[in-house]
């Protein structure tokens, strides 16, 4: 295919940022080549490929970004959302898809018979699907005077959660901590920031724990033990999400003297 250019045995290594990825696209055009691999820092590099370090140049990144803007929303969303995927090899997949789009125009997003277009579509769908599911199952709790939630997603989905929660909780201060990737989405006083975090220290206070105990009792009261089907449950709520859902955790003991009524 004409958009492939010359395939080399060189791996591009870059800083892992989206701007850095756009610079890899720029370098690919400047050298009229397709790299054998595109490696962010977390993936390292394969020893049997020669390597070329691609440094982030904001001017180069802006030129490629402007080109994506001209290709339309569908193409741009596929690239930006697909970039949040953590599957190995996604960087090279997206670079090849961008080249296809520049060669074929916006219609390339619909060319799912092309392996590069199909692979980019699969990346976008994987990220979107996980974000949609987590929107339903995120559990906030009161932590250190604000709402806090911990998640362990496979992909870096925080940017896709931003619009949903900021529009529905505009007057709340909240933090969503992605423990799998060490990042957090902070909404405070109407402003949004992304933070790097190694851990989320503040724990739930006793009032919050009381609410969690009551919610767990309510959840348990609705359960019909004879009809429990864990396989069906996992088909609706993947088990990897359970660790962040209070109702799926072991029972919390009520403090001494608490007014505990049996849930029938």
Where are these predicted regions, by residue range?
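Short, hydrophobic/amphipathic alpha-helical patches that form generic packing surfaces
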Residues: 20-31, 95-103, 163-167, 213-220
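Acidic, Ser/Thr-rich peripheral helices and adjacent loops at domain boundaries
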Residues: 53-62, 191-204
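Short coil/turn segments at secondary-structure boundaries
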Residues: 78-83, 179, 228-234
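Internal, well-folded beta-alpha domain core
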Residues: 107-198
């Amino acid at each position: 295919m004409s958009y492939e250019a010359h395939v080399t045995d060189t791996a591009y290594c870059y800083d892992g940022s989206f701007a850095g990825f756009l610079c890899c696209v720029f370098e690919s055009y400047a050298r009229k080549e397709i790299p054998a691999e595109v490696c962010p820092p977390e993936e390292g590099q394969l020893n049997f490929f020669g390597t070329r370090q691609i440094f982030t140049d904001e001017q180069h990144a802006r030129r490629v970004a402007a080109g994506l803007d001209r290709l339309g929303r569908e193409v741009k969303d596929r690239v930006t959302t697909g970039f949040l995927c953590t599957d190995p090899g996604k960087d090279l997949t997206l670079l090849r898809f961008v080249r296809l789009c520049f060669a074929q125009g916006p219609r390339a997003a619909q060319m799912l018979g092309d392996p590069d277009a199909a692979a980019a579509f699969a990346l976008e769908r994987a990220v979107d699907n996980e974000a949609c599911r987590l929107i339903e199952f995120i559990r906030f709790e009161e932590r250190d005077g604000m709402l806090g939630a911990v998640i362990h997603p496979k992909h870096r989905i925080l940017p896709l959660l931003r619009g949903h929660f900021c529009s529905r909780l505009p007057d709340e201060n909240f933090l969503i901590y992605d423990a799998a990737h060490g990042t957090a989405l902070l909404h405070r006083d109407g402003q949004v920031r992304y933070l790097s975090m190694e851990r989320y220290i503040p724990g739930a206070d006793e009032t919050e724990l009381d609410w969690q105990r009551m919610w767990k009792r309510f959840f348990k009261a609705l359960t019909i033990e004879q009809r429990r089907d864990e396989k069906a449950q996992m088909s609706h709520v993947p088990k990897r999400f359970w660790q962040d859902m209070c109702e799926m955790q072991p029972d919390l003991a009520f403090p001494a003297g608490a007014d505990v009524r049996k849930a029938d």
